[in-house]
């Protein structure tokens, strides 16, 4: 019901922490991309069968990290994966995820530190974002 409300309010996509087949149906009927959180190969396969093009691995660090992504991509190279949780805006971390085969990553508190927000330090956030994008451009395979 929440996804339908946000779609009615103009959402262009829906991202969730888990896979919900009912949300997949709502999004498919309205031609809205749905990126569910998946923690296993079975969840990814089921999400793909219901029309999800991009699957979010969440929490990526707890599910197996970059090696989990690499192991999924070997038998399922068509799988588009977004890693979230345990993703940091550093070259070591981002290069590991992109070398493993992620399509994209999601970052929250590591990219937008509470201290920077509380201190209105928008320049440090801008710098973190800029640095992260430069690293991603270096390693992302198009």
Residue ranges of model-derived segments:
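Active-site mouth loops of central-metabolism enzymes
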Residues: 29-38, 82-89, 117-118
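Catalytic beta/alpha-barrel core
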Residues: 1-4, 10-19, 33-45, 53-63
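Glycine-rich phosphate-binding active-site loops on the catalytic face of alpha/beta enzymes
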Residues: 17-23, 56-65, 101-121
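Catalytic cores of alpha/beta
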Residues: 1-9, 42-50, 87-105
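Glycine-enriched alpha-helix->loop->beta-strand junction motifs that scaffold or abut catalytic
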Residues: 8-14, 28-35, 49-54, 75-79, ...
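C-terminal helical cap(s) of enzyme catalytic domains, especially alpha/beta-barrels
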Residues: 27-31, 98, 114-142
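Generic structural signal for well-ordered alpha-helices
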Residues: 3, 24, 44, 66-69, ...
């Amino acid at each position: 019901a929440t996804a339908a409300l946000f779609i009615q309010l103009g959402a262009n996509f829906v991202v969730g922490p888990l896979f919900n087949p009912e949300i997949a149906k709502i999004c498919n009927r309205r031609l809205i991309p749905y990126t569910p959180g998946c923690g296993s190969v079975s969840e990814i396969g089921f999400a793909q069968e219901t029309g999800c093009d991009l699957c979010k691995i969440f929490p990526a660090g707890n599910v197996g990290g970059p090696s989990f992504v690499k192991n999924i991509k070997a038998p399922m190279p068509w799988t588009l994966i977004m890693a979230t949780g345990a993703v940091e805006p550093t070259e070591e971390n981002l290069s590991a995820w992109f070398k493993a085969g992620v399509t994209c990553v999601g970052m929250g508190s590591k990219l937008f530190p509470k201290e920077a927000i509380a201190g209105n330090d928008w320049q440090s956030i801008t710098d973190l974002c800029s640095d992260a994008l430069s690293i991603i451009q270096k390693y992302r395979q198009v």
